[in-house]
Amino acid sequence: MRAALAQANARRFAALGDPTRLQVFALISRAPLSVAEVAAQLPVSRPAVSQHLKVLADAGLVSLETAGTRNLYRPDTDAVASLRDFIDSLWDVGLARFKLQAEKVARERAATHRKEKR
């Protein structure tokens, strides 16, 4: 992973590390929402929601769109894809290691079974 991408993903994961911020992100992932709409669904004030959205935006996780007089927040699809690609790469490595270990155990069992038959 390139250093710049690693830094960007680290900022994104750090931004999502706050439980309230993670809830905010989950809400806007379902549908674009305004600050007031997010605040209505959480036990935090509008100014607090605004601050959480600012942190998410600074990390590149959300984008803002204007719909008439409303400002709506939504996840940035490129940023989410980058995080998913990173997690998928970890999963791929883990599966490959698991496969190697399973094959090793199968070979050892087969060898033990052959010895017992002699």
What are these regions (language model features)?
Residues 17, 42, 73:
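Catalytic tyrosine of NAD(P)H-dependent dehydrogenase/reductases that use a Tyr as the general acid/base
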